[in-house]
Structures are given as C-alpha cells and as structure tokens.
Amino acid sequence: MGKFQSKHAAAACKRRESPEGDSFVVPAYGSGRRGAEETDRRAGSGVEHRSRDKQELLNGDPKEGPFWDDKGSLEVVLPPEKSEGHEGQGQLFSTDDGEKAASREGPLRLSKKHLNIDALQCDVSVEEDNRQEWTFTLYDFDNSGKVTREDMSSLMHTIYEVVDASVNHSSGSSKTLRVKLTVSPEPSSKKECPLTGQDREPTRGRTEIELTDEPRVADRRLSAYSRKPNADPQPCSVRVPYCVDENTERRNHYLDLAGIENYTSKFGPGSPPEQARQEHHGRATHIPSRSRSQESDAHAIHHRRSQVLAEHVIPANEPATRALAAQPRIKGQEKQFLRSPKGPGKPLGTPGSGKPGKALSYCLQAVPLPQSAQDGHHLPQPPPQPPPQPYGHKRYRQKAREGHSPLKGHGQPTMVEHEVVRDLPPMLGPEGYVMPVVQRHEHHHHHEHHHHHHHHHFHPS
C-alpha cells in the first residue's frame, strides 16, 4: 500500500527526494533565487547540487552556506514557466489547503504575489520520475452511492499513515505531499476530497463530472480553482492535493488489485474495501451456498442410500408402508441418476458427486449392512411375512434374471435394474410381497456373491 508507484521506483527514489521536499519549502524563503536554482537543477546539474540543496532545506536557512555566492549568476536567471511552475506546487498547496499549510509552514503564502499561477499545469506532466504517486481507488462503502463522514475520516487516517510511511522511506525531512483522492462509484463518477480535519463534509452533488475528464484537464481545473478559490463555490476541488497524472494502466492495475487484496488494510491499495469486501463476501456466500447444494446432493445420496438400507432392514423392524411411501421418491431420484454420466459403473451410494456422500455411504454400509445381512442373507424369510416370501422370490428370480442379462449386456446403469424391479410390486398384489422383492433385489445388486449363496440356498426348495 505504501509502495512507490512511479515507473522508475529504484532510480527515482533518490531523485525525487529533493524536488518533493524543496518544492513545498521553497516559498518560505523568497522566490527568485529559488526559481533560478530549480531551473539549474532541472537543466542537469549534478547529484552533489541536489544533496547540497537538501542540506540547505534541512537547515532551514538557505542564505547560509558558501555555495550561494558561487551561484551568484543563477540568481538573475528566472525562466518564468519552469521555476514558477515548480514553485506553483507549493503555492497551489498553500492555496488549496490553507489551514494545513499554516499549521506546518506558516510563511508559505508569503510568495503568493511572486507567482504566475497560469503556468501551474506545467508541473503536472514535466517530470514523471521525480514524483511519487499514491492512488486510492474508493468504491461505494454502503452500496447506496453515499460515503459517510465516518468512512471519510477513517479513510483520511489511513491515507495519512500510508503516505507518512512512504515518505519516511525516502527522506527524513518534513514534507508536504499532495494526495489526489477520488471517490468514484460505478454508475456516475464523483469526486470527493475533504482532506482537512476542519472540513470533512463530502460535497457530492456539485462535482460529479470531475472524474470523467482526462487527468490533465482535471489538473488544469485544479489550477483554475487555486487561482480563484473564492469565486468558485466548490471547496472540494480546491482541496484536491498532489497533482499527478493518473496513469490508466496504474488505475487498471489497482482495479485488478481490488478483487485480490481485500484484507490488507481497511482501505487497500486501490481496493478499499467495503464494496470489494462485500463482493468477496458475496462470493464467499456463494461458495457456502454451493457447498450447501453439494451437501444437499450428498444428503440426497445419503437419504437414497439410507432408504435402500432401510428397505433391507424394514421386514424385521418397521411396517411395509414406509418403504412404499419411500419408493416414488427413490424412483424419481434414480431417474435423475440415470442421466448422470458417472452413474453406470458405481453402486448406489457412491455416485461421485461429493465426498460427504461417499463417507456417509461407507459409514452406513459399515453399520446397518451386517444387520441386513443377518436378516436377509441367513434368514431368507423375514418374521412378519413368512408365507409369501418364497413366491415373491421366485417371481423375483425370473424377472431379475430377465432384466439382468439385457441390461448388463448393454452396460446400462444399475439403477435401471432397480426400476425394472420397482415396476413389479403393483403386480405382486399385497404389500407383503413388495418388501422381499426390494430386499432381495438390493441384495443381488450390491452383493452378488450373496446372491449366489441365496441361489444355492433356495434352489433345492
């Protein structure tokens, strides 16, 4: 968040120290000699010139030191556009944010009469690598197009901390930096920049067109506002700090970061927060809902499996009406299951749609199947319906074998066999015949070795 956003970060880190610092401290002590010295520095005087200028700034007394006498000729040269333009940063800031400038550097506004403020837009686009840019792209905090004062105050605290941390990396001197703060919701572009603590009320409705312009045009408007701050009723634009060309790539980069770094800080590097977090929260709620749908599928599989296993145990435990009530639901689920491509080679409880279903199926297989095996395998005639049991099994043997050979030959899903046998109970008459058929068919499908065991067991009878 406190990264240097200029293109040449490594090289410009040292080069931007002096212009950032002196451009704001300059108007405190005269203008002519400062402009000449700035012109010479831009023309390409060396690194030692910058370091001496920095020492001079840190000492706060520019007229001391021997090198001012050496540069006596430079005091006369005063190119108006570059020197005044660069001094214009200090003047623009003192005009824009008068209270803050007065608290930090009182005599900043003394040089107001020496400046030609028409050239203020020159310093916006001249030296890119001597500037440092922080872009805070803000979204709707509450999804209603309104930004409250609490949001803005916490945002300003965050911006102060970030800029302070970034500036301390580059220089130990006291600097006044200009931060361009734009609040832009998606439907209509707005600009909102209450920077000072005295005036933090957002001026939303009056400056909605600002952000749609190009950055240089917006900066030109800023210079116009600084020329006549009393004539224009928009204090927001007067207070917009740090005239920096908003790079389109950089802006898109921050917009891309908005979806990624949601939790770095409350107002992330171009992803502040609330709407991005709400989008993230929406995605997070979609993910649990998706997982809930998977859980519901797994629950349906578990329900299907438990119904099948309940049909194993029902002759010994519960009346047959529950199995009859459960048959249409299982039949509809099996018809759904027929259409899935993963169905053919897998048993009923493991359709491959979710690991919870598999785990539940295995647990159920481990727990109730021994009882069903005891009830069904070794006790071929359940206690409630002793007489119709063999008849139902003979009918079932014929139908099941007729159904198994063509269906398995074609590689159809195993649920088709179940549906073939499901169609048998209406022909079997009373409810007593239904239960053994379902029980034996499920036995035959899931445990074919038991089927052979039953076959040999029933064959003599």
From Swiss-Prot:
Q: What broad class describes the main subcellular location of this protein? A: membrane
Q: Where is the composition biased (Low complexity)?
A: 341-350
Compartments in which it is found:
Cell membrane; Cytoplasm; Cytoplasmic vesicle
Q: Known post-translational modifications?
A: Ubiquitinated, leading to rapid proteasomal degradation. Interaction with TGFA interferes with RNF25 binding and protects against ubiquitination mediated by RNF25.
- An example Gene Ontology molecular-function term: ATPase binding
Provide the binding site for Ca(2+): D140, D142, S144, K146, D151
N-myristoyl glycine: lipidated where?
G2
What is a biological process (GO) this protein takes part in?
A: Golgi vesicle fusion to target membrane
Q: In which tissues is it expressed?
A: Expressed in the cecum, colon, esophagus, ileum, jejunum, skin and stomach.
- Using the UniProt annotation, give all residue ranges assigned to the region (Disordered): 1-106, 176-205, 263-302, 321-359, 372-414, 441-461
- The Pro residues compositionally biased stretches are 380-390
Occurrences of domain EF-hand (ranges): 127-162
Question: Keywords for this entry?
Answer: Calcium, Cell membrane, Cytoplasm, Cytoplasmic vesicle, Exocytosis, Lipoprotein, Membrane, Metal-binding, Myristate, Transport, Ubl conjugation, Wnt signaling pathway
Q: Which GO terms describe its cellular component?
A: basolateral plasma membrane; exocytic vesicle; lateral plasma membrane
- Indicate yes or no for the key word Protein transport: no
Positions of the region Interaction with TGFA? 307-396
Which ranges are annotated Basic and acidic residues under compositional bias? Answer: 34-73, 97-106, 188-205
Which intervals of the chain are annotated as region Interaction with DVL1, DVL2 and DVL3? 121-186
What family, per the record? Answer: Belongs to the NKD family.
- What note about domains is in the entry? The N-terminal domain comprising the first 224 amino acid residues is mostly unstructured.
State whether it acts alone or in a complex, and with which partners, per the record: Interacts with RNF25, TGFA (via cytoplasmic domain), and PPP2R3A. Interacts with DVL1, DVL2 and DVL3.
Query: What task does this protein carry out?
Result: Cell autonomous antagonist of the canonical Wnt signaling pathway. May activate a second Wnt signaling pathway that controls planar cell polarity. Required for processing of TGFA and for targeting of TGFA to the basolateral membrane of polarized epithelial cells.
Protein name (record):
Protein naked cuticle homolog 2
According to its UniProt entry, this protein's organism is Mus musculus (Mouse)
